[in-house]
From Swiss-Prot:
Entry keywords, A to Z: Lipid-binding
Family matches, as PROSITE patterns: DEGV
Ranges for domain DegV: 4-278
Organism per entry: Streptococcus pyogenes serotype M3 (strain ATCC BAA-595 / MGAS315)
Summary of the function given for this chain in its UniProt record: May bind long-chain fatty acids, such as palmitate, and may play a role in lipid transport or fatty acid metabolism.
UniProt-listed InterPro entries: DegV, DegV_C, DegV_domain_contain
Binding annotation for hexadecanoate: T62, S95
Domain of life: Bacteria
UniProt-recorded name of the protein: DegV domain-containing protein SpyM3_1149
Listed Gene3D superfamilies: 3.30.1180.10, 3.40.50.10170
GO molecular function: lipid binding
Length: 279
């Protein structure tokens, strides 16, 4: 039986111990801050990137990993005896990373199945972790691909932003439907679905977020949850408030983590994401 390994990109928000335990390969994106290039993997310390972004003269710019880095990553895995690679990446609505991964696989001439997770952050983690667990347990490539697709189809990702400034400056506002770019200081909740950010609600103050969540939980209370996660940019207080509200409906552990530099660049400070995988 061959060896299958899972590759993903650093837009994933995941506990470091899981990466190690499941032997997941994470290819880093890059962030340019005031003409200095940082590897996303070097910005994982809590609050580090946000402090750099707040002090920068202009909005940081993210860039996908070079094609050559993907090619090198895949070649190195094959040299170690890996027979199949499954690469799971963030939505093309947010980055061209998936295309760089495909091109890297072609250059390396290695057996790579490149998948669009449809998401990013911890919603992508749901797929990556399950795939890695299955690979370790000796599942076949087809079994892993089927499981990843099933998880993707049952996952929902909701993003709340406190300012649209980063989305506007980063050129992502065109992919956010139903929002006037002039309303920069409005609170907005969006869903990432079918590689598009779609506005659900907008308003003033954090009550916009809590009211949306209460309504969402009530409407979906009949649906059994497999796992749920919350990510945040900046202070954790809002994320912890949301966690308390979710706990009334879901009595299992809820992962609350700071999102990485790639997502924070797009969302700005004060943002959060609620990600749910249903049974």
């Amino acid at each position: 039986m061959g060896t299958i390994k899972i590759v993903t990109d650093s837009s994933i928000t995941i506990e470091p111990e899981l990466i190690k335990a499941l032997d997941i390969t994470v290819v880093p994106l890059s962030v340019m801050i005031d003409s200095k290039l940082y590897s996303d993997n070097d910005l994982k310390e809590e609050g580090h990137f946000l402090s750099l972004m707040k002090a920068s003269k202009s909005l940081p710019k993210t860039s996908q990993p070079p094609v050559g880095l993907f090619a090198e990553t895949y070649e190195n895995l094959v040299k170690k005896g890996v027979t199949d690679i499954v690469a799971i990446h963030l939505s093309p609505a947010l980055s061209g990373t998936i295309e760089a991964s495909r091109q890297g696989a072609e250059i390396a001439e290695t057996p790579v199945t490149v998948l669009d997770s449809g998401f990013t952050d911890q919603a992508m983690k749901f797929q990556v972790v399950e795939a890695a667990k299955m690979a370790k347990a000796g599942a076949s490539l087809n079994e892993i691909l089927a499981a990843v697709q099933a998880i993707k189809s049952k996952t929902e990702l909701y993003i709340g932003v406190s300012t649209l400034e980063n989305l506007v400056k980063g050129g992502r506002i065109g992919r956010v439907t139903g929002v006037l770019s002039s309303l920069l200081n409005v609170k907005v909740v969006m869903a990432l679905k079918n590689d598009e950010l779609k506005t659900l609600v907008k308003g003033r103050g954090n009550k916009t977020f809590t009211k949306w969540l209460d309504s969402y939980l009530a409407k979906n209370s009949h649906r059994p949850i497999a796992e749920i996660a919350i990510s945040y940019a900046g202070e954790a207080s809002l994320a912890l408030t949301l966690k308390e509200r979710i706990a009334a409906y879901y009595n299992h552990s809820i992962s609350v983590l700071e999102t990485g530099s790639i997502i924070q660049t797009h969302t700005g400070e004060g943002a959060f994401a609620v990600m749910v995988r249903y049974e």
